[in-house]
C-alpha cells in the first residue's frame, strides 16, 4: 500500500486540504526532515519498475473502443477498460465477447 503524504499542519486548520504541498517555511521542521515529523515524498518510496503503471489488480490497463481492439488483447497480462464513447448496446456486446475470450473488464 502506498504511503499517504499529507500537507503540513493540515489537521490544524480546516481550510487546508490533505493534498500534498511542499513545506517552504524557513524554520519548518518538516522541511528539515526532523525526527518525529511527517515524512516527505522521496525517490525511495517509488514502486518497483515491474509493477509501475499497472492496475492494482496486476493487469496492464488498456483502453478499448471497438471489438478489434478487444480481440487483440492478451488475457494473461492485459485488462480492458471500455471507452466512455462506446454506447450501451455495443458495450453489452463487448462484455459478452470479453467473457468468451477470458479478458478482465475494469469498468463493466
From Swiss-Prot:
<dbReference type="GO" id="GO:0022625">
    <property type="term" value="C:cytosolic large ribosomal subunit"/>
</dbReference>
<feature type="region of interest" description="Disordered">
    <location>
        <begin position="21"/>
        <end position="44"/>
    </location>
</feature>
<dbReference type="GO" id="GO:0003735">
    <property type="term" value="F:structural constituent of ribosome"/>
</dbReference>
<dbReference type="InterPro" id="IPR023654">
    <property type="entry name" value="Ribosomal_eL32_arc"/>
</dbReference>
<keyword id="KW-0687">Ribonucleoprotein</keyword>
<feature type="compositionally biased region" description="Basic residues">
    <location>
        <begin position="21"/>
        <end position="30"/>
    </location>
</feature>
<comment type="similarity">
    <text>Belongs to the eukaryotic ribosomal protein eL32 family.</text>
</comment>
<dbReference type="GO" id="GO:0006412">
    <property type="term" value="P:translation"/>
</dbReference>
<dbReference type="InterPro" id="IPR036351">
    <property type="entry name" value="Ribosomal_eL32_sf"/>
</dbReference>
<dbReference type="InterPro" id="IPR001515">
    <property type="entry name" value="Ribosomal_eL32"/>
</dbReference>
<dbReference type="InterPro" id="IPR018263">
    <property type="entry name" value="Ribosomal_eL32_CS"/>
</dbReference>
<dbReference type="Pfam" id="PF01655">
    <property type="entry name" value="Ribosomal_L32e"/>
</dbReference>
<protein>
    <recommendedName>
        <fullName>Large ribosomal subunit protein eL32</fullName>
    </recommendedName>
</protein>
<keyword id="KW-0689">Ribosomal protein</keyword>
